[in-house]
């Protein structure tokens, strides 16, 4: 089984859309990230009705990666609802997730997002944010 298949299977295992309360629902989007060392971490989204609480599956997976391994560099990311990414924007990260990936580690610009699971079409984070505002600051941090 290849990495993308393993990521899909691990994320699919936690796909379980449900209401947590009258105000919060969860698990309707799931994600898997492959860390620099090859470990796979998963996460699911949680959303609240008033808008102040929303955690995307991608960021949840990234939090888990950092919490359980201390890693910040990502190689691959896969996110989906009820089926694998199929193109046409499915599986693409929101702006907050794109930003968090780069703020976590500027080298994540080379990370690949799965766009179409069937054809294995991917896109790099750098293509999603070609002129990131934090590039200079990140370079200075890396030079410390």
Q: What is the predicted function of each stretch?
A:
Residues 43-52, 83-87:
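A short glycine/serine-rich beta->alpha loop
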Residues 45, 56, 94-97:
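Disulfide-bonded cysteines in secreted/extracellular proteins and peptides
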Residues 66:
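A glycine-rich beta-to-alpha transition motif near the start of alpha/beta enzyme domains, typified by
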Residues 50-60:
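A short, polar/charged loop-to-alpha-helix boundary motif
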Residues 1-21, 63, 71-144:
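C-terminal binding/interaction regions
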Residues 25-36:
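Short beta-strand scaffold segments in enzyme catalytic cores
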Residues 39-40:
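Hydrophobic "anchor" residues
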Residues 26, 56, 72-74:
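Short connector loops at helix/strand junctions that flank enzyme active sites
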């Amino acid at each position: 089984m290849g990495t993308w298949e393993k990521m899909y299977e691990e994320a699919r295992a936690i796909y379980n859309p449900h209401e947590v309360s009258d105000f919060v629902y969860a698990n309707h989007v799931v994600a898997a990230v492959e860390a620099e060392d090859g470990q796979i971490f998963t996460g699911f989204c949680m959303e609240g009705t008033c808008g102040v609480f929303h955690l995307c599956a991608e960021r949840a997976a990234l939090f888990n990666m950092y919490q359980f391994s201390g890693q910040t560099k990502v190689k691959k990311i896969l996110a989906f609802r009820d089926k694998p990414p199929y193109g046409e924007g499915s599986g693409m990260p929101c702006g907050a997730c794109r930003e968090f990936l780069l703020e976590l580690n500027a080298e994540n610009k080379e990370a690949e997002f799965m766009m179409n699971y069937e054809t294995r079409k991917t896109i790099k984070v750098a293509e999603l944010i070609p002129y990131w505002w934090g590039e200079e600051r990140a370079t200075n941090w890396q030079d410390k």
